């Protein structure tokens, strides 16, 4: 059995979990998330805890029990606390501005870049060089952050570009004559 799946998922008081044979739905103050289930993992509810176990002894079922436990834990955390991803812009003239569900970026191209936010993700720009993404779905928040970073990834010689706030960019040494 997966070691991750041995730990139960605690359900906070303000979170509601609906478990059916082919779907699990988690709703809370920050939204509602659902996940389709396969028959490889058996989920049991014991009061305020969810326990996960492999339905069969196959390697795939044991691996999926830990994966599903992590996904459900992220869903419960997302609808109760939410997830945040911060990006910083480094470079002369690089700036970001949030306008409703759009993020307008000036990244040194000949044209401005506009990125539309998907449902469930909000964007804020506390300063022109900072972007804060928040949402209930960890996968979607991370995907949007990766898409924004891909517009101008940090280059290795000066480090200019869009980077995660906690990212360390290793700067290469320039060529010596």
From Swiss-Prot:
InterPro entries assigned to the protein according to its UniProt record, in alphabetical order: Ribosomal_uL6-like, Ribosomal_uL6-like_a/b-dom_sf, Ribosomal_uL6_a/b-dom, Ribosomal_uL6_bac-type, Ribosomal_uL6_CS
Pfam families associated with the record: Ribosomal_L6 (PF00347)
GO terms under cellular component: cytosolic large ribosomal subunit
Ribosomal protein in keyword set: yes
Keywords of the record: Ribonucleoprotein, Ribosomal protein, RNA-binding, rRNA-binding
GO MF term set: rRNA binding; structural constituent of ribosome
SUPFAM superfamilies: Ribosomal protein L6
Superkingdom of source: Bacteria
Listed GO biological process terms: cytoplasmic translation
PANTHER family referenced in this protein's UniProt entry, alphabetically: 60S/50S RIBOSOMAL PROTEIN L6/L9 (PTHR11655), LARGE RIBOSOMAL SUBUNIT PROTEIN UL6M (PTHR11655:SF14)
Assembly with partners or alone: Part of the 50S ribosomal subunit.
Role, per record: This protein binds to the 23S rRNA, and is important in its secondary structure. It is located near the subunit interface in the base of the L7/L12 stalk, and near the tRNA binding site of the peptidyltransferase center.
Protein family according to the UniProt entry: Belongs to the universal ribosomal protein uL6 family.
Name of this protein: Large ribosomal subunit protein uL6
Organism: Methylobacillus flagellatus (strain ATCC 51484 / DSM 6875 / VKM B-1610 / KT)
Gene designation: rplF
């Amino acid at each position: 059995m997966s070691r991750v799946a041995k730990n139960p998922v605690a359900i906070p008081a303000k979170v509601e979990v609906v478990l059916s044979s082919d779907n699990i739905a988690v709703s809370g103050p920050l939204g509602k998330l659902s996940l389709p289930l396969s028959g490889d993992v058996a989920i049991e509810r014991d009061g305020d805890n969810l326990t996960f176990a492999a339905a069969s002894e196959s390697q795939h079922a044991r691996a999926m029990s830990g994966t599903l436990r992590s996904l459900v834990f992220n869903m419960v955390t997302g609808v109760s606390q939410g997830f945040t991803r911060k990006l910083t812009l480094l470079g002369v003239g690089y700036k970001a501005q949030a306008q409703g569900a759009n993020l307008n970026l000036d990244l040194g191209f000949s044209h401005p870049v506009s990125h539309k936010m998907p449902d469930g993700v909000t964007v804020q720009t506390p300063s022109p060089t900072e972007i804060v993404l928040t949402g209930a779905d960890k996968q979607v928040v991370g995907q949007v952050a990766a898409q924004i970073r891909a517009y101008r990834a940090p280059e290795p010689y000066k480090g200019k570009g869009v980077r995660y706030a906690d990212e360390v960019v290793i700067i290469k040494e320039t060529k010596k004559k």
